């Protein structure tokens, strides 16, 4: 539940060169054409994987991201690290958190120091019940990007699940203060959790 609450990250493919391709091509078709022109180019494979990810074609996305990693064993331009991060995102979307954790850790090991990696790793760890470790990664996401408001919600969920009610309340309040006032399902869910925790504290 906690992992699913945070797994609404929007992933976008990097812009590419349209060249002489028809204007009505989908992003997948455009990226597929690029791979046909350069099948051993890891960047083309990465971008095709991202296009498949956007289209929610997860099996195809995984295949292309794995191929991007294989084609770039030296992690030139940090492409293998990026591919591992996005592979982890695909695995997390498929509820394969244990494998996602491995992919996110590999992205970090390869030097992809981005708040999104730490946030996603925190989400995967939370879904596996590894709350103390998740808390470390959510905090790192906030250190790298203080505007990563989802990390406050993640911290709240991890603290709540580990029985640290006061800390959970603080993080939920920070989250709600940081996000725009909307009727978003995630915001409503956090408001409800916060209200229940405050009620529980009064008992």
Residue locations for each model-derived region?
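Helix-start (N-cap) detector for alpha-helical repeat units in TPR-like alpha-solenoids
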Residues: 42-43, 76-77, 81-82, 115-116, ...
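Terminal, low-structured helical/coil segments at or just beyond the last alpha-helical repeat
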Residues: 22-25, 161, 167-203
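Canonical tetratricopeptide repeat
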Residues: 47, 79-82, 86, 120, ...
């Amino acid at each position: 539940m906690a992992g699913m609450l945070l797994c609404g990250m929007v992933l976008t493919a990097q812009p590419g060169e349209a060249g002489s391709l028809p204007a009505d091509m989908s992003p997948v078709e455009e990226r597929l054409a690029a791979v046909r022109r350069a099948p051993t180019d890891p960047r083309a494979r990465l971008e095709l994987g991202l296009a498949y990810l956007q289209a929610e074609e997860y099996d195809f996305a995984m295949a292309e991201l794995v191929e991007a990693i294989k084609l770039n064993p030296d992690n030139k331009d940090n492409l293998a690290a990026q591919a591992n991060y996005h592979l982890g995102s695909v695995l997390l979307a498929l509820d394969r958190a244990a494998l996602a954790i491995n992919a996110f850790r590999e992205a970090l090991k390869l030097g992809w120091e981005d708040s999104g990696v730490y946030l996603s790793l925190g989400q995967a760890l939370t879904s596996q019940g590894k709350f103390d470790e998740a808390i470390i990664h959510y905090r790192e996401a906030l250190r790298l990007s203080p505007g990563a408001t989802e990390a406050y919600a993640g911290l709240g969920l991890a603290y709540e699940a580990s029985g640290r009610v006061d800390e959970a309340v603080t993080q939920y309040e920070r989250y709600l203060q940081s996000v725009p006032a909307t009727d978003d399902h995630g915001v409503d869910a956090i408001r409800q959790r916060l209200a229940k925790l405050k009620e529980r504290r009064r008992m």
